Amino acid sequence: MRREYVKKLEITSLGVPIHKPCICHCLRYSFGICNLQHPEICDNCEELFNFFDLIKNNVNRELHESLDDYLKRLISWMGHHTRKLYLNTHVQVNLDELDEDGAVIIVDYKMRILPCSARETKSQFFGKRGWSLHSSLVYTKDANNNKLNVQVFDHWSDDTGQDAWFTASSLHTVFKNLDPKPKWVTIMSDNGPHYHCTKLMLIIGHWKDWYDVIPRKWIFLEAGEAKTLIDSHHAQVISHYVQVIILFT
């Protein structure tokens, strides 16, 4: 079902959503930028909604509320895949713009990570502060073979602080260790306050003087979207961390 639904969503290679007459497949409508009519509903979508109506007509009324809740969840699930397609396309658009002088950096925080033990009590668990992990995936293009290279930089703090200073410190280390160093960068992140804030924007204004790197643009995406690769990296890091903890417990 997911594959068939996503196939009917259309977006240009430049990341521009395309109008569709079926409102369920119109990306422009999904993001509130469509002023055209949606005169029809496709057969698959109509069958889906008719299916829920059919069930409601053949079950007790006390189950109707649960069915409505399931339908809302299904619509939310469809919305998630709509956003994912749209935002992942924008990631690809920026990667396609790369040349040998630039870099695309995708950054993200892992939510608070709690130290774990195989034999800890509940009071021990809730008393912990945990630590924060910040990852930067740096994409550059090899001028010799025109292929993308990826470097990963992980930084963690022994508290749960996720703010502009931790972000700036992490990126400082990235620029100091990148080899070769790019002439310009595009940053992609969620729109959390640790990125989307005045303090960090003021710091970015000094990047040219400090690192000889031009910040071409900073793209803010929805939290949790379009970061599949960095999410996979976080999963591997946490899995390795948990295995080490268990081994030494």
Where are these regions (language model features)?
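Extended mixed-charge, aromatic/glycine-enriched low-complexity segments
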Residues: 1-249
